[in-house]
Curated annotation (Swiss-Prot):
<dbReference type="GO" id="GO:0051205">
    <property type="term" value="P:protein insertion into membrane"/>
</dbReference>
<keyword id="KW-1003">Cell membrane</keyword>
<protein>
    <recommendedName>
        <fullName>Membrane protein insertase YidC</fullName>
    </recommendedName>
</protein>
<keyword id="KW-0653">Protein transport</keyword>
<feature type="transmembrane region" description="Helical">
    <location>
        <begin position="326"/>
        <end position="346"/>
    </location>
</feature>
<keyword id="KW-0997">Cell inner membrane</keyword>
<dbReference type="InterPro" id="IPR047196">
    <property type="entry name" value="YidC_ALB_C"/>
</dbReference>
<feature type="transmembrane region" description="Helical">
    <location>
        <begin position="422"/>
        <end position="442"/>
    </location>
</feature>
<feature type="transmembrane region" description="Helical">
    <location>
        <begin position="8"/>
        <end position="28"/>
    </location>
</feature>
<dbReference type="GO" id="GO:0005886">
    <property type="term" value="C:plasma membrane"/>
</dbReference>
<dbReference type="Pfam" id="PF02096">
    <property type="entry name" value="60KD_IMP"/>
</dbReference>
<keyword id="KW-0813">Transport</keyword>
<keyword id="KW-0812">Transmembrane</keyword>
<dbReference type="GO" id="GO:0015031">
    <property type="term" value="P:protein transport"/>
</dbReference>
<feature type="transmembrane region" description="Helical">
    <location>
        <begin position="498"/>
        <end position="518"/>
    </location>
</feature>
<feature type="transmembrane region" description="Helical">
    <location>
        <begin position="459"/>
        <end position="479"/>
    </location>
</feature>
<dbReference type="InterPro" id="IPR001708">
    <property type="entry name" value="YidC/ALB3/OXA1/COX18"/>
</dbReference>
Amino acid sequence: MGPDNRRILLATVLSVGILILWQVIFPTKKAPPKPAHPPAAEVAKPAAPASPAPGAAAPAVPAPPPDAPEETVTLAGKGFEATLTTYGGALKSLRLEGDKFRKQEKDREVQIDLVHVTSGQPYPLSLSASPELGGAVDVAADPGARAPMRIVANDASSVTFEGRVGNLAARKTFRVTGKPYELALDVELSGGAGSGTVGVLYPAFMPPDTKSGGIFSGPPLDFVRPVCRAGTTTERFDLAKEGAPEKLEGQVSWAGVDQHYFVAAVLPAEPIGTCTFVRGPVKGAGLAAVAVPVEGGARKLSLTVYAGPKDLDTLRGYGRGFESAIDYGAVAKFFALFARGLLYVMRWLEAIVRNWGVAIILLTVLVRLVLFPLTYKSMQSMNEMRKLQPEIEKLKAKFGDDREKMNLAVMQLYQKHKVNPLGGCLPMLLQMPVWFALYAALQTSVELYREPFLWMKDLTAHDPYFILPIAMGISSFVMQKLSPQPADNAQAKMMLYFFPGFFTVIMLFVPGGLTLYIFVNNLLSIVQQQLMMKHQQAAPAPAAGK
């Protein structure tokens, strides 16, 4: 590899490395979208009287007393356990079942709960009426959304609540459908007066100091954001920001809360209403409100609730762009298609070997086989350059500190012996898209979450003992030792020592699955290089240029 080309490669790798470190240390903060003030009828119009207009039918369901004690009902579904509360007739908790869906909380492991609310917030799937229907001005702190409801029917697979939403009588029935991570919700509104909207609320809370991650650094497991699919666009709402409500254009296909490898969302039978992100009542709290039109004081809704892992095939099965709940991030999004391809290959391999770590190792071997013709030619070029090292040493002695003349002479030597100095760059450049795609898969694919390999408990997290990054750094050093060294001694030392050390630092906190891939790839490169060197030892060195 020529000196200039080595500098180009080194500059490229260092630039990527510095960008990775910068994003890990200083995560990118997404700028808030331009506020879109929703119509006054939906959010900010002064409240209308709660009593029905003259001549309107009286409500069929009396409101429970405001100080009614809370009652809860638990429904066991396929892969989850949902607890529903009489406060708003809503979802109080939804815990995923199984050892895979656990997280560390202080000194113990607990099941992952997909409900994240704080004091003063409504619960997920509660309802809030617009002022025209007797509701509050501020939907994020609407006390009516937490108003007590009555349990009027309950069995092992369903529960029905009755109560009031503004001046409407409301009946809500939750049913376990038998599908993984799915509930059905039927809503019947009646007995009101006038027209307005009723919001189906999906709130979330996250401590304001929670880091969001950066382009190359994934968010923590408990990083949550309200999310909505309106029209053909999926938008996420930054809870750390402050500002006015943000209304999305287009009818709503689904809305809910995004939690890294998981999503909890409500999906109407067909696109309806509008979606508005509303902040409050405290910092770090907010919600997605799906405003559904109610004409003549009555409306029926049939909703599907999915709360579970972001399995690509499962989300695609719902249609409505639900697979866009998987957020590949800014840079990783560019490699999303490639990442999905790698995931399908790894799933196929894991089905055979029953271990995701071994599947990553086999993926590394497969990629090496696919790229073998190109890497073989590249290593041939590197070996030819190695044979020219004695001639390069003579040129260094001849030209001394005159780097310009020495570099020109080296390039002429390469041209004379038809050696491509760029050949040594090829293996790394070809692998870089695979690295980024694998990183995207590790950061977004729930299949790999909490999957162990050897001493690592989770391939999506960094190696807790830093064994793999150090081993990867050592293998990078060996690879550099086997590579032809630049004519420039200072540059040779940088390539030999600084590059492996810097690369090791970069890899300390990236997912262990990616470090495993690069380490195994380095080992295969070393073995291939050694075999080729042994095979070509008997070949005569090219004649020296004169």
